[in-house]
Amino acid sequence: ICNRLEELGMLSISNYNKMKPRTKKVYSLTKEQKIISNKIKSDWIKNNKPALLAGISGSGKTLIYIDLISSFISNNKSVIVLVPEIALIMDLYKILDDHFPGKVISWHSKMKISDKKFGLIKIKNNKSTIIVSTRSGLFAPLSNLGLIVVDEEQETSYKEDSKSPYYNSRDVALMRSKFNQSNLILVSSSPSLESYYNSKKNRFNYYTLNNRYMNFEVPKILILNMKNKENYRKGSSLISAKLIDEINLVLSAKKQILLLHNRFGDYTKKLYKILLKLFPKSNIARYDSESVKKYGYFKILNDFHEKKIDILLGTQMIAKGIDFKNVLLVGVINADLGMSLPDFRAEEKLFQLAYQFIGRAGRHSNGSKAIVQTFNPDSEYIKSIQKYNIDKFYDYLL
């Protein structure tokens, strides 16, 4: 009705944003980050090749691409930032909105139609916009597209393989950047083997961060051979005696624990019940597809951020790019799950999952630990994990 009245000249429609303008948050890069950020910018001027940014978890890769985004926004360019899961949008949206107030839009399949319409209005009215999205945001009708960021680029969630059209968002991002003559940066602490290979062949410019932000220590990794009976404690067939002891120490220090069990369904429920018996005074929660469906992504993660949860047990969802500030211990219950699957990528995926998950610990403090339970401690993947040697492992796979 309003649109019709406007056509008749009886009223005028305008958009009004009631939100008060906020002050832009000031951030600072370390010397290592500044060097890499400046190198990426200068290399783009020279050859405009896609950039692959790697480095240990917690090294500040996000701050580097925020610095890159800033240079594009200041030149009235728009930016797309892709994340693999809806659950990751909330944290990244807050970070980007602090740095670029009023310019950030979230976009995903669970949004209300009204929110999407409001987002499209902002896209239309603003010359420079930042979209934080899952893979669907890659098709947003942005003008002046200057940069595409694919965070956690190794994630299989970027692949649409359940319905037509089938595509990999990373590859679509590569093509859109070519069509729009924009820049592309792929970001991951454990890149996909394809991207690593492309960097080896000089198709991508490769950059890596070797130190954690603020020089926090990486977690000390302890590998437990679960073939040894002495690693077990009576009443616990899945959790080693060492892991139980370490959990108790961390709980007494009022810190939090993440546990990874990459198995869906009853196995996770069984482990959850074991944890309840072992640590009856602790608040324990699950983070898997069933619990997310019941409580929602944001409810579980927000409760953990607010320290309402002491131990969070999850499937592979728990390993993906979330910045937990109070986690001092992570435990991989069975690092071998998935190794025997008929998939030539099985070992690569296990390495990436464990590498990402271990990086959730000690992001804002020293003294963190990671305990990896395995029946194959001599496998190349386990030995590479213990030494944080990603290049050696990828060269072994290639």
Identify the function of each model-found stretch:
Residues 1-20:
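Interdomain "pre-motor" coupling segment immediately N-terminal to P-loop NTPase/helicase cores
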Residues 2-3, 37, 196:
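Short, well-structured alpha-helical segments
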Residues 24-30, 34, 47-129, 133-398:
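Inter-lobe coupling/hinge segments of SF2-like helicase ATPases
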Residues 34-44:
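Pre-Walker A adenine-sensing motif
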